[in-house]
Swiss-Prot record:
This is ATP-dependent RNA helicase dbp9. Its EC number is 3.6.4.13. Residues 587-604 have a biased composition (Basic residues). A motif (DEAD box) lies at residues 184-187. It holds the Pfam family DEAD.
């Protein structure tokens, strides 16, 4: 692997300066000597004190040093590299107002994260006027439009590696004057299949570029990127208790495959979990199967997967953070497809790193490979990552806010993925809950319609999860349901599952895509001009692909658990559709029309008996 040369053509040294930090310095944004326009933007965004990663990274970045920072999502790492880059751009523009050149490049693994970074740049450069221009290359626009956007030499570009290489190939983008390179979620960039793009980019970037590598974990992929792009980087390892799952209550439920649906129904219908919930499932079909299943009981939810247009995915996350939706069903496709993409060499390197990490007491994952049952087991075929799934990711990078619970409907295949999933809750010092469904080995495959392949290894994966969490000082507790009371709802679950056929799932997928395409493409410009009308768009509507059974939305009193009544009072339940919204519409319309005299036959007209007036035709 080619190592990056500095401005004097000297290879980077292997020894890097490490900055072990335990507590953030008592610094504020005033002491960082930022441009007044940036400080004004910080005040407007209510940034009062730098986070640990910001207080350490920003001064080093302003000194021109390369930085490799281990920082979790939500720690403020985006501002940690955006502010120094904007500061440098403003200084250059002050010295030469006519300067037009692309000096900053931010690489991210997914479109959702690109949009998130772009929004942060826009907020921080709000008072910079035309001195700072940024472009998001992941937007779904034509090549001609993208070429026009790049023709004006924007100062800062946010993109996935694939889009950068595509524009370099057409000469629409020039990196000749690049001075800053950021790779956000660096450990994901290679695992998402951007290996060739990264290698090509390493050859295209000029020497002496200041590099920021931001990652939630320090893995072999990050070491590869460090060798390609960094020059003696300063390594920041910020010890953050929140990063290790503090404040998250972790529970596990052992259940059969069809009981996952039963327990999910009971949890949401009886409101055993209150607040916003993210449900992780294994693939797109599982998304719609669960959504259609919940629709039978009047439980609304949103779907997030790689098939939906990027604008719809971003809007769903934004509305979820605002509290418009309470339940998101997310397909963690990359966790399933990307788990077998590492080569034998990288696996050996990872195993070696893990041994060292265990000795150091590191919290990194012990193995990144899914559990295989037996030595003689044939390796499963590597699933080809589609173009849509390549730049989609939901368990990492996206900053979900105020999530009360993460529900692992399908258990992830590695303890590393589990850690990233549960990290969506318990943020900013708040309490959170993680509930995982585990299928015992003797229950796997007994209910074919609801079976999922990865559930075969649930018990072995759970053992690794428990072991890792124990090292971190956390306990994964069993969550017990009183199955005698839960079984009273089983016949309803069976009726609902029977209605969610494979054909219904296919129709739901197609209908959802059609609806979201209309919202995303045709109305995009209209909503930019009329932002208030965008609030009327909802993504949790009923797909109505499955057979509707209105009686399932109502829970009779005799089904309500006797012990649970005290905890679920009528005041606490909130609105539940106990009555059908469209009940007896035709009958009500008839009664209303009778009062107006409509539909009545004129008085005096005798009723004709058809049996008396029937004439047999002659032969």
């Amino acid at each position: 692997m080619k190592r990056k040369l500095d401005a004097n053509d000297v290879p980077s040294t292997e020894v890097a300066e490490e900055k072990e930090t335990k507590d953030a310095d008592n610094t504020d944004f005033e002491s960082l000597n930022l441009d007044p326009r940036l400080r004004q933007a910080l005040i407007r965004e209510q940034f009062t004190k730098p986070t640990p990663v910001q207080s350490k990274a920003i001064p080093l970045a302003l000194e021109g040093k390369d930085i490799l920072a281990r920082a979790k999502t939500g720690s403020g790492k985006t501002a940690a590299y955006v502010l120094p880059i904007l500061q440098t751009i403003l200084q250059k523009k002050a010295a030469d107002p006519s300067l037009k050149a692309t000096t900053g490049l931010v690489l991210v693994p997914t479109r959702e994260l690109a949009e998130q970074v772009q929004s942060v740049i826009i907020k921080f450069s709000a008072f910079c006027g035309k001195d700072v221009r940024s472009v998001n290359l992941t937007q779904k626009v034509s090549d001609a439009v993208q070429r026009t956007m790049l023709a004006d030499y924007p100062d800062l570009i946010v993109s996935t590696p694939a889009r950068v290489i595509a524009n370099l190939g057409t000469s629409a983008l020039s990196l000749e004057h690049l001075t800053h390179l950021v790779i956000d979620e660096a450990d994901l960039v290679l695992s998402y299949g951007y290996d060739e793009d990264i290698n090509a980019l390493a050859k295209a970037i000029p020497r002496g570029v200041q590099t920021f590598l931001m990652s939630a974990t320090l893995t072999s992929e990050v070491d590869t990127l460090k060798g390609l792009f960094c020059r003696s980087p300063v390594i920041l390892k910020l010890e953050d208790k929140e990063d290790e799952g503090a404040g998250i209550s972790q529970f596990v439920v052992r259940c059969a495959e069809d009981e996952k649906f039963l327990l999910t129904y009971v949890i949401f219908k009886l409101q055993l979990i209150k607040g916003k919930v993210i449900i992780f499932v294994g693939d797109i079909d599982r998304c719609y199967r669960l959504k259609l299943f919940l629709e039978q009981f009047g439980i609304k939810s949103c779907v997030l997967n790689s098939e939906l247009p990027i604008n719809s995915r971003i809007h769903v996350v934004q509305e979820f953070n605002k509290g418009v939706y309470d339940i998101i069903i997310a397909a963690d496709e990359q966790e399933v497809m990307g788990s077998r993409t590492s080569s034998k060499k990288s696996k050996e390197a990872t195993d070696g790193d893990d041994e060292a990490k265990d000795k150091m007491g590191s919290s990194e994952d012990e193995d990144n490979e899914p559990e295989q049952s037996g030595k003689s087991a044939r390796p499963e075929k590597r699933r080809k990552t589609s173009g849509k799934a390549k730049d989609y990711g939901i368990s990492r990078g996206i900053d979900f806010q105020n999530v009360a619970c993460v529900l692992n409907f399908d258990l992830p295949t590695t303890s590393k993925s589990y850690t990233h999933r549960i990290g969506r809750t318990g943020r900013a010092g708040k309490a959170g809950m993680a509930l995982s469904f585990v299928v015992p080995a003797d229950e796997f495959g007994k209910h074919k319609p609801t079976s999922f392949p990865t559930a075969k290894h649930d018990e072995s994966v759970l053992a690794k999860i428990v072991k890792k969490q124990a090292k971190l000082g956390h306990e994964v507790k069993p969550y017990h349901f009183e199955m005698k009371q839960v079984d009273a709802f089983r016949y309803r679950m069976t009726d609902a599952l029977r209605a969610v056929t494979r054909l219904a799932i296919q129709e739901a997928r197609a209908r959802e895509i059609r609806q979201e395409l209309v919202k995303s493409e045709k109305l995009k410009r209209h909503f930019e001009e009329n932002p208030e009308e965008l609030k009327q768009l909802r993504h949790d509507g009923e797909l109505r692909a499955a057979r509707i059974q209105p009686h399932l939305k109502h829970i009779p009193d005799y089904l309500m658990p006797s012990k649970g009544r005290k905890g679920i009072s009528s005041e606490d339940v909130g609105f539940v559709g106990f009555r059908k919204s469209g009940d007896n519409r035709i009958r009500k319309a008839r009664e209303k029309n009778r009062g107006k005299g409509k539909g009545r036959k004129p008085s005096g007209v005798r009723k004709v008996d058809p049996l008396k007036t029937f004439n047999r035709g002659r032969k």
